[in-house]
Swiss-Prot record:
Keywords: Ribonucleoprotein, Ribosomal protein, RNA-binding, rRNA-binding. Binds as a heterodimer with protein bS6 to the central domain of the 16S rRNA, where it helps stabilize the platform of the 30S subunit. Transmembrane segments: none annotated. The keyword rRNA-binding applies. Belongs to the bacterial ribosomal protein bS18 family. HAMAP family: Ribosomal_bS18. It comes from Shewanella baltica (strain OS155 / ATCC BAA-1091). GO terms for biological process: translation. This is Small ribosomal subunit protein bS18. One of its GO terms (cellular component) is cytosolic small ribosomal subunit. GO terms for molecular function: small ribosomal subunit rRNA binding; structural constituent of ribosome. Part of the 30S ribosomal subunit. Forms a tight heterodimer with protein bS6. Coiled coil: none annotated.
Length: 75
């Protein structure tokens, strides 16, 4: 029986040496929100605590400025 090998998660922001996450970088921020508009937790993305806080702050600022939607499921 073959075992499933789970790939180790790593923080992309630490690896790239990002100083601060910019709220105007919508392409990057969209990778960290779900289809329904929720912020993806760090245990799933592998983002470190420092950058997860910056990410949440940037997403909330972008939402406030209408750069990102609060939700995509309008019915």
């Amino acid at each position: 029986m073959a075992r499933y090998f789970r790939r180790r998660k790593f923080c992309r922001f630490t690896a790239e040496g990002v100083a601060e996450i910019d709220y105007k970088d919508i392409v990057t921020l969209k990778n960290y929100i779900t289809e329904s508009g929720k912020i993806v937790p760090s245990r799933i993305t592998g983002t470190s605590a420092k950058y997860q806080r910056q990410l949440a702050r940037a997403i909330k600022r972008a939402r406030y400025l209408s750069l990102l939607p609060y939700t995509d499921l309008h019915q």
